[in-house]
Swiss-Prot record:
Keyword Metal-binding on entry: yes
Assembly and oligomerization: Dimer of alpha and beta chains. A typical microtubule is a hollow water-filled tube with an outer diameter of 25 nm and an inner diameter of 15 nM. Alpha-beta heterodimers associate head-to-tail to form protofilaments running lengthwise along the microtubule wall with the beta-tubulin subunit facing the microtubule plus end conferring a structural polarity. Microtubules usually have 13 protofilaments but different protofilament numbers can be found in some organisms and specialized cells.
Gene3D superfamilies in the cross-refs: Helix hairpin bin, Tubulin/FtsZ, C-terminal domain, Tubulin/FtsZ, GTPase domain
Reported cofactor(s): Mg(2+)
Listed name of the protein: Tubulin beta-7 chain
Role this protein plays: Tubulin is the major constituent of microtubules, a cylinder consisting of laterally associated linear protofilaments composed of alpha- and beta-tubulin heterodimers. Microtubules grow by the addition of GTP-tubulin dimers to the microtubule end, where a stabilizing cap forms. Below the cap, tubulin dimers are in GDP-bound state, owing to GTPase activity of alpha-tubulin.
Binding of Mg(2+), residues: 69
Subcellular location as annotated: Cytoplasm, Cytoskeleton
Phylogenetic lineage: Eukaryota, Viridiplantae, Streptophyta, Embryophyta, Tracheophyta
Chief place where the protein resides: cytoplasm
Amino acid sequence: MREILHVQAGQCGNQIGGKFWEVVSDEHGIDPKGNYVGTSRVQLERVNVYYNEASGGRYVPRAVLMDLEPGTMDSLRTGPHGQLFRPDNFIFGQNGAGNNWAKGHYTEGAELIDSVLDVVRKEAENCACLQGFQICHSLGGGTGSGMGTLLISKIKEEYPDRMMLTFSVFPSPKVSDTVVEPYNATLSVHQLVENGDECMVLDNEALYDICFRTLKLTNPSFGDLNRLISTTMSGATCCLRFPGQLNSDLRKLAVNLIPFPRLHFFMVGFAPLTSSSSQQYRALTIPELTQQMWDARNMMCAADPRHGRYLTASAMFRGKMSTKEVDEQMINVQNKNSSYFVEWIPNNVKSSVCDIPPTGLTMSSTFMGNSTSIQEMFRRVSEQFTVMFRRKAFLHWYTGEGMDEMEFTEAESNMNDLVSEYQQYQDAVADDNDEDYEDEAMEN
């Protein structure tokens, strides 16, 4: 029941996805060959959220892996967890998308998309009650952004009532991979606004900062960053997979976090994050988790929540703890920082508690916030987009694949609309609406 189908697209998506399956397999006591080696009955109780039980008692991830070039997938397949996945679920092209959104969305990706959809259908038919899809991809490249958004829109067409959750890695302000990132990201956001239900915004720079500052890693690798992301991903769905006192699922999350359908871009955070050297000196308490979880330096995207206001937020705690104390801490945060929450949505922080902590910790918490300050990310990408688009720089790569300049203009204005919507709700005050109603009543 309540299965989630996982899709990973492009190099970034596949690398995050690979780590994610390591984390989840570890939690459920499943070894790299797919056999159960755990110790607790709880691990198997709802293992079918992410795994399908195959013949011989093997557990196979409900995962679809796609890319437009074979490289990343080959390294996944030959890696330690390569034999976990179903071989038919690896779908790849040969040419690559060359960091070109148009290739991923219209030409190369469009040729491959039908075979991806076949596998998605096959996996969806294996589910008793599919809850939704989770998609890992980056927005700066070609495959994850172009083909990833193409897949999202196709899945939305076929399964309009299932939740669509994305973990999207945005281009970072300082760490740039390719020059056309702003184009790819803007075109992708244009799609995500329309077709995504919940979008977790991540970016490499913020993750690097967490690794340097908090985890005290001198030379963090992508593996370290991906482990951070995957712990957060597993925290987002722990309530579906383990028993808890206050449960939450993808739909409850959406209902509680999204006040207006277009504003579904969330900041995520995770606590506790401690450097390995100071781990042994630290006792975990709920107040400490709460404090770190709401800390601006703990957010996994380069936007500062202190520059905006929270429309809504959700905290998912894991471990043995009292729900009363959790609620007290949440109320405490809201009372102390009331100026950072919009006052026209009362009780806008949802908390849930799951009894089983992640491997190696006694308790942890995952944070998701719908903050208006996320507009900083979009604003930054939009400025870079405009600088290039004004000069029509590199446009021929996209028009050569059959795209129209009009699409760029549309995507740009959609993103700017999104920024101004966030700004509008940041500035809104509670009593505005009453006056409007009175004016209307008088006119009538």
